Amino acid sequence: MTVTRSPRYGWIKRYTAVVLTLVALSLAGCGGSSDSNDSAAQTATVTQTTPQVVVQTAEHGFDAVRVFHEASPGVVTIRSVFRGGGGAAEGSGFVLDPEGRIVTNAHVVTDESSGSRKAAKEVFIEFPDRNIVPATIVGFDPFADVALLKIEPDGFDLHPLRLGDDSELVVGQPVAAIGSPFGEQQSLSVGVVSATDRSVESLTKFQIEGAIQTDASINPGNSGGPLLDAGARVLGINEQIETNSGSNSGVGFAVPVSAIKRSVAQLEEKGEAEYAYIGVSTQPVYPQLADKLGLDTDHGGMLSEVVPDSPADKAGLEGGDKRLTFQAIPYEIGGDVIISVDGHPVVAPDDLGRYISTHQPGQTVQLEVLRDGKREQVDVTLGKRPRG
C-alpha cells in the first residue's frame, strides 16, 4: 500500500478580480530533520514528552467565553494589496504592544507570484471597533512565517495580547483560536493541542520546527490569528492545515510563540531574521535500523545528504552513498551519523535542527559523529541560512 500525505494550506483569503485562490504550502517532504534546502527526507515521527505541569482542562477553569472576552479586542483583520496585479489577501493578526506593533503570518502580507517573495504594496488593519488604518511592514521572516507590522497608535485604545509559553504544552490541553475565517471577523473556535513539536513547511524549503498541532477549526482567513491558552495568552499563530479537500479536517498547525518571540526581536532590530545553517539532511536512527546497519548507536541523525560548499561540507561531513529500503522506508545509507550536538543527544528527527536553531551564524558547534564504526568529534562553524 502506498501512503501519501495530504497537502497543507496556508490559510488566508486571497482575492483576485474573479476567483478566490487558496495559497498552498506543499509538504516539506517526508523526513527527519532537514537543514538543507532539499525536502526529500522520510516522514517525520515525533517523540512526545510529558512535562510535569498542571493541565488546563475544563475542570481547571478553561472558559472559552472568558478567553474570547479577554483576547478578542486585540485580534485584528488584515487586508493586503499586492503589486503587479497580484490581487488582495485577507488574514488575521493580533496586537503585540501599546506602541502599535501587530503580529501576523508573513504569507498574509507577502506574495511570491513574481518569483521572489515581496511585501504587499498596501496593508490595512481593521479593529473590532470597525476602525480601519494603514500599516507598515517592519519586516517579515519567511523561515518562521512571521511578519511584524506597525500602525500609528495615537487616538486608538489598543488591547495587546499577552504572550504565553509553548515549552510546557501537553497533548490534550484545551486551546482557542480567534480570527476571520472566510471573512467572518471575531470568530472563535475551540479544540485541544493534538500534538507538539511538529515540523511543517515554511515559506522557504526549510521547516518550521516545534509547530503546535490542533483540532481547533482553522479555515481561510484564520492565518495570523492567535492560538490561545486558558489564560488568553498567545501560544502561537495559526498558520496552515493538512487536508485532502482544501477545507478544515481537524489537523491545523500554529507557529509556536517561542519562534514568534525570536522573529519579532530580530525584525525589530534589523528588519530581517537570520538563522544558523549547517547544510545537511538527516534521517533518524532507531534500534531496529541500527541493528540492520550494524551501528554502534540506537539513536542519531543519519546524514542522507550534505549540501556542497555548506558548513557541513567544509567540515568534512559525509552523506549517504547507497540506498536501502527497510521496514517500508527508503534510506540513504553509508554516511556519517550525528550522535550529539555540544553534548545534547540527537534522538528525535528534529533534534539536530532544533539545536542548530539555538545558535547564530558564525558560531561553532561540536558534533559527535559515528563514521566507519568509530566515534569522532567534528567542529562545524555555522553559516547563514539561505532563503532559496
Can you name each region flagged by the protein language model?
Residues 26-29:
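C-terminal motif of bacterial Sec signal peptides marking the signal peptidase cleavage site
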